[in-house]
């Protein structure tokens, strides 16, 4: 924010209001600005508005003119928006927070509760869920409070001003970089399946690098955020307002420093990730399409052709959905802030509302990610169903009716029995018999579990026709080495 000294024009306030600041005899700037909400409010990688310079002029102890009652009420209640929008924004943010927190919590529990889910690639999804959970529980509530407040609502601790801004940026950077890492990892696994697969230690190292990079990208906010206290004119003090008003501002060393950082954030947090995600998933689409074509020629069953075509269509829809949802979610907020930084228009209530809507669209990614990376993954969906329907295998429904829990319990018993039978059958097959079940070379990669990066060759297809193997009952070690990775 720019503070201009010794100017005579009145300061521009929200909703067209004006209030003059004043300079003391010692030439230190004292001013009161009705609201610089988006200057003092940083929502992570994206910044909001740089308002015009705060102008100061002489103001006597009683004020140069009477203040509007609405303006006085906003100061006394520390509200930047009127009641209708105030309650609507709280409700809309509340819905996002609840659904986002619930979905991401399910993902975290699903990975932690069972060892079989703690794979190297699931760590990326776990990391994304943790960052999105922080978006829901930290970034959104803090941002909502700052949007609704006319001045800094969190007391006089300057470290809190710096930390909150950096934490908001950190969560968004981690979320978008994690999405990019997931896309790149899937590209490597599916397009280059013969390369060494990612190990657990390697995945942990990459995740540590993601957090370190995000922390580095967010660190300028910790450096340049400052908490300042402005003296309140006597007129407002007489009606009960505190002696000083706190603002958490960005104090960049140059006038355009904030604009440059906004450009940098736009590139790192939006343009580069959307480019990588789009290119990676387009490459995956082409690879899967070529595999399906090869296997379709070799397939002897019309039903198998239909099933592979259905799976390919589902995968294509998922690929397109991930890229589009990511782009659409973050586009409004990034370009709103870029436009606002260039225009430096006075902040009004309508601008605050537009900003809040763009911000909620961006934060909606925290709600969609558990669906795209969790529910659409067969492994995670089964875990979600078990978490949401915790019942024992012997649970008996009331009134003698069968419930969904009973059905799931029976299904789990069948899967367990199938796994035991499959182990016996595979031992009878032996290495030679197992090898004969493959579809042969690249053609054997008939279908790909896109969400996990595991391939299904002719061997697994042959097995699953007789015995239902699930992700909780993986292929035994006797034949794992024969399957392409």
Curated annotation (Swiss-Prot):
Q: Which GO terms describe its biological process?
A: G protein-coupled receptor signaling pathway; larval feeding behavior; multi-organism reproductive process; neuropeptide signaling pathway; olfactory behavior; response to odorant; tachykinin receptor signaling pathway
Coiled-coil spans in chain: none
Q: Where is the signal peptide?
A: none
**Does Translocase show up as a keyword for this record?**
no
Give the matching SUPFAM superfamilies.
Family A G protein-coupled receptor-like
Could you tell me where this protein is found in the cell?
Membrane
Major place of localization? membrane
Q: Name one GO cellular component term.
A: membrane
Q: Which Gene3D superfamilies match?
A: Rhodopsin 7-helix transmembrane proteins
Q: Which residues lie on this side of the membrane: Cytoplasmic?
A: 113-122, 185-202, 284-317, 377-485
Please name every pair of cysteines joined by a disulfide bond in this record. Answer: 161-248
Q: How does it sit in the membrane?
A: Multi-pass membrane protein
Q: What UniProt keywords apply to this chain's record, in alphabetical order?
A: Behavior, Disulfide bond, G-protein coupled receptor, Membrane, Neuropeptide, Receptor, Stress response, Transducer, Transmembrane, Transmembrane helix
The family database entries (CDD domains) matched by this protein are listed as: 7tmA_NPYR-like
UniProt keyword Ubl conjugation present: no
Extracellular-side positions: 1-91, 144-163, 224-262, 339-355
Q: Which Pfam families match?
A: 7tm_1 (PF00001)
Write out the transmembrane intervals: 92-112, 123-143, 164-184, 203-223, 263-283, 318-338, 356-376
Q: What happens when the gene is disrupted?
A: Increased NPF or NPFR activity dominantly suppresses PAIN-mediated food aversion in postfeeding larvae. Deficiency in NPF/NPFR signaling causes decreased alcohol sensitivity and overexpression causes a hypersensitive response to alcohol sedation. Controlled functional disruption of NPF or NPFR neurons rapidly triggers acute resistance to ethanol sedation.
Q: Which family does it belong to?
A: Belongs to the G-protein coupled receptor 1 family.
What does this gene product do? Answer: Receptor for NPF. Integral part of the sensory system that mediates food signaling, providing the neural basis for the regulation of food response; coordinates larval foraging and social behavior changes during development. Required in dopaminergic (DA) neurons that innervate the mushroom body for satiety to suppress appetitive memory performance; a key factor in the internal state of hunger in the brain. NPF neurons coordinately modulate diverse sensory and motor neurons important for feeding, flight, and locomotion.
Indicate what this protein is called per its UniProt record: Neuropeptide F receptor
The source organism is Drosophila melanogaster (Fruit fly)
The protein's gene is named NPFR
């Amino acid at each position: 924010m720019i503070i201009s000294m010794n100017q005579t024009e009145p300061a521009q306030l929200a909703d067209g209001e004006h209030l003059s600041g004043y300079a003391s005899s010692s030439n230190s700037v004292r001013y009161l600005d009705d609201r610089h909400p988006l200057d003092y409010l940083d929502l992570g990688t994206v910044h909001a508005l740089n308002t015009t310079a705060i102008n100061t002029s002489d103001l006597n102890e009683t004020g140069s003119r009477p203040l509007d009652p609405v303006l006085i009420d906003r100061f006394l209640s520390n509200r930047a928006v009127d009641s209708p929008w105030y309650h609507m924004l709280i409700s809309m943010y509340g819905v996002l927070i609840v659904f986002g927190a619930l979905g991401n919590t399910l993902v975290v529990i699903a990975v932690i509760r069972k060892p079989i889910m703690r794979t190297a690639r699931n760590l990326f999804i776990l990391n994304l869920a943790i960052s999105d959970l922080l978006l829901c529980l930290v970034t959104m509530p803090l941002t909502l409070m700052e949007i609704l407040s006319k001045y800094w609502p969190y007391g006089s601790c300057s470290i809190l001003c710096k930390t909150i801004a950096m934490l908001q940026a950190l969560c968004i950077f981690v979320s978008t970089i994690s999405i990019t890492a997931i896309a790149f990892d899937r590209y490597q696994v599916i397009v280059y399946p013969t390369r060494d697969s990612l190990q657990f230690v390697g995945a942990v190292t990459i995740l540590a690098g993601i957090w370190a990079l995000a922390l580095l990208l967010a660190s300028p906010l910790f450096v340049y955020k400052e908490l300042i206290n402005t003296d309140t004119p006597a007129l407002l003090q007489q009606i009960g307002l505190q002696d000083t008003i706190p603002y958490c501002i960005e104090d960049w060393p140059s006038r355009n420093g904030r604009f440059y950082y906004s450009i940098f954030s736009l590139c790192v947090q939006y343009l580069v990730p959307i480019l990588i995600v789009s290119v990676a998933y387009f490459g995956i689409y082409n690879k899967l399409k070529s595999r399906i074509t090869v296997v379709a020629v070799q397939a002897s069953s019309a039903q198998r052709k239909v099933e592979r075509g259905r799976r390919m269509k589902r995968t294509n829809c998922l690929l397109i959905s991930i890229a589009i949802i990511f782009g659409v979610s973050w586009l409004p907020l990034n370009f709103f802030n870029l436009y606002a930084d260039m225009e430096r228009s006075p902040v009004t209530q309508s601008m605050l509302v537009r900003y809040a809507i763009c911000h909620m669209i961006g934060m909606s990614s925290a709600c969609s990610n558990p669906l795209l990376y969790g529910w659409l993954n067969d492994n995670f969906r089964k875990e979600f169903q078990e978490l949401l329907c915790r019942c024992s295998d012997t649970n008996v429904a009331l009134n003698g009716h069968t419930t969904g829990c009973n059905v799931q319990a029976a299904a789990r018993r069948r899967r367990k029995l199938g796994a035991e039978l499959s182990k016996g059958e595979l031992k009878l097959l032996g290495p030679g018999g197992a090898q004969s079940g493959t579809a042969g070379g690249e053609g054997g990669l008939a279908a790909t579990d896109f969400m996990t990066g595991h391939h299904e060759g002719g061997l697994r297809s042959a097995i699953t026709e007789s015995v239902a193997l699930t992700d909780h009952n993986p292929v035994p070690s006797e034949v794992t080495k024969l399957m392409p990775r």
